[in-house]
Structure formats: C-alpha cells, structure tokens
Amino acid sequence: MEPFVITASECDCNSAHSSRVSKDGYALSDELSNETMFLTQVKYIFEGEEDHIDDNTMQEINTDIVNVVIVELDETLEIKNVELISDEYQLLGFSNDADNDLNLTILSEFPADVSPGTRDLGKLVTRYQHQNKHLKHMLQEL
C-alpha cells in the first residue's frame, strides 16, 4: 500500500485551519500556509501489529495525543469508515477523491474567550455570524 495523505479542512472559517501531512509524517507545503496548521508528532498504530508497540512507545503516545483519526479499511484497502476522536473538532464528513487522498471536513469548537467589554462591537458581530453559520451547517448535516 502506498502512503496516503490526510487533509483536514475546517468547514466555514471560525478560525482557518487546514492540515496536510503525508503518511510518513512529513508536512506538505501549501500556498495557503499562513492559514494552515500542520499535524505534528504523528503516530501510526495498525491493528494486529502489537509487536511494534512496547511499553516505552505507549507512554509516549498516550501523553501527546491531541486528535485521533481512525481509518477503517476493507481487505482491498478501500476506505470504509473514518472516525475522529477529539476535544476540539467534530468530523462532519469525509471523502476519498483520489487513490491516496483522504479529505476530512471538520468543525472546530467555538472559542469561549468572549469578553464584550474588551472587544470591538464589529468583531463580536462577525464572530457571532461565523458561529451562526457553523450552527446552521451542523443542523443541515444532522
């Protein structure tokens, strides 16, 4: 099986995040690099390959995990299902446009640092408009 690329792009930009990393863990450059967050410390664990996991490796993995993407493949290595386990993001959908590309559509949590006394009214209006777009998109996906 050739390495595949997982691309995660945030739906409607509450804060623009898009991530591209190769299966080998190398960040891929993008023309929108100023709006891009690259995945770091990528670990791969494959079902049935317990011999690659020792006690020292598991301690490393468990302390640094932020987001977990579970990709379920069938016997022909076709993607059957994708699941995202994260405190910060919700998976809205996925697509497999090319043989080695997995595109995830994600939605980030709303930031909770709203302090109306210290923010410009125009910025607050823009922020709530973005949040309303997110909520509408979530309701349509249900």
Swiss-Prot record:
Its main location: cytoplasm. Coiled coil: none annotated. GO terms for biological process: autophagy; chromosome segregation; karyogamy; protein transport. It is found in: Cytoplasm, Cytoskeleton; Preautophagosomal structure. It holds the Pfam family ATG31. Keywords: Autophagy, Chromosome partition, Cytoplasm, Cytoskeleton, Karyogamy, Microtubule, Protein transport, Transport. InterPro entries: Atg31. One of its GO terms (cellular component) is phagophore assembly site. Plays a role in starvation-induced autophagy. Involved in mitophagy. Functions with ATG17 and ATG29 at the preautophagosomal structure (PAS) in order to form normal autophagosomes under starvation conditions. May be involved in microtubule function, such as chromosome segregation and karyogamy. This is Autophagy-related protein 31. The lineage of its organism: Eukaryota, Fungi, Dikarya, Ascomycota, Saccharomycotina.
